[in-house]
C-alpha cells in the first residue's frame, strides 16, 4: 500500500472514530436528559403522594369530628 493510501486509510479510520464518538456523545446526552425527566417525574409523584397523605389525614380528622358531633 502506498504511503498516500495508508494515510487516507488512517484518516478515514479517524473520521469514523470521530463520528462514532460524536454519536455516542449525543446518545449519552439524550440518556442524561431522559434520566433528569424521570427524576423530575419521580419528584412530582412524591410531592403528590405527600399531598394525598395530608388530604387523607385531614379527611380522617374531619370524620372523627363529625362522629363526635351530637346527631340532631
From Swiss-Prot:
Coiled coil: 27-55
Keywords: Coiled coil
Domain of life of the source: Eukaryota
UniProt name for this protein: Uncharacterized protein C25B8.20
Amino acid at each position: 500500500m502506498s504511503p498516500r493510501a495508508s494515510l487516507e486509510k488512517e484518516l478515514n479510520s479517524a473520521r469514523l472514530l470521530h463520528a462514532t464518538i460524536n454519536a455516542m456523545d449525543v446518545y449519552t446526552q439524550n440518556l442524561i436528559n431522559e434520566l433528569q425527566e424521570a427524576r423530575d417525574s419521580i419528584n412530582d409523584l412524591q410531592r403528590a403522594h405527600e399531598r394525598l397523605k395530608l388530604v387523607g389525614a385531614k379527611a380522617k380528622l374531619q370524620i372523627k369530628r363529625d362522629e363526635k358531633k351530637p346527631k340532631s
